[in-house]
Amino acid sequence: ISPQICNSATLSTLHGCPPQEIERIATYLIQEKGLNTFIKCNPTLLGYEFARKTMDEMGYDYMVFGDFHFRDDLQYEDAVPMLTRLMKLSDELGLEFGVKITNTFPVDVTRNELPSEEMYMSGKALFPLSISLAAKLSAEFAGKLRISYSGGADYYNIDKIVGCGIWPVTMATTLLKTGGYQRFTQVADKVEGICPKKWERIDVDALKKLAADAITDGHHVKNIKPVPNRKSTKEVPLLDCFYAPCSEGCPIHQDIPQYVAPVSYTHLTLPTTPYV
C-alpha cells in the first residue's frame, strides 16, 4: 500500500488570516511536501461595494453585512502578487497550483435564523459572487490560474462552470433539497462529455459572460413572490423516516410518486392519474 495518501491539498484559512501566513503555509505544502496546492479565496476579494450592489440588484437587499470582513480579509492587491509567486514556484517544481473559489461569506443573523451573530451564505445567492470572483481572477491571469469551484453550483449551472474550464466542482447546498444525493445523477448526466482529459486554460470570455448572466438569471435572483414553507409538521421516526414531500404538500394528497416513475417510462395510465 502506497504511503502517499494523496498528492494535493486545498488550504482554507480563517477569515482575517494575514497574506504572509497564507503564502508561508502554501509554500511549505509545495516546497517541502511536494503537493499540488490550491488556496481557498473569499468573496470579500470582490470588495464591499460590488457585493452590496450585486445583492441589492438581485433582491437580496435584506441580507445584512458590513465592511469589516472586506477590510480584515485578504486584499485583492495582496492576493495577485502572492498567487503569481506561488504559480511560479509550483511551475518550477512541476506541480499544479490554483485557487478554490469560494470560501464562506458571512452575513448577520437578524431574524433568529441561528443562535449566533453571523451565519454563512450559500447556494444560489452565493453563486453570482463566487463566479464573479472566478471571472475577475481569470481575467487578471489571462486564464492561466487554475480554479476549483464551490459556491452555488447545481444542476442549472454545472455544465456552464465546467465548460469554462473550471473543475473539480464541489457542491453541498443542493444536496439538502428534495432528492438528496440522487441529484448527483442529474448533474453527472449534464456534464458527461464536457470535461476534457487535460486542463489547458480557462475560457475567460465564456466565464465573464456566465458571471454577467448570473446577476439576472431567474434561478439565482430572489423571487418576488415569497416561496411557501414546505416544511412538514408530520412526525417521523428517527430511522426510515423518508417520505415524499410532494405527497404531503399536495392539497388532496395524491400519491404522486406512484405515477412519477411510470411517466418517465411512458407507462402512464390516465384513469388512475387524471390530474397529470
Region roles according to the model:
Residues 240, 244-264:
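Iron-sulfur cluster-binding cysteine motifs and their immediate structural context
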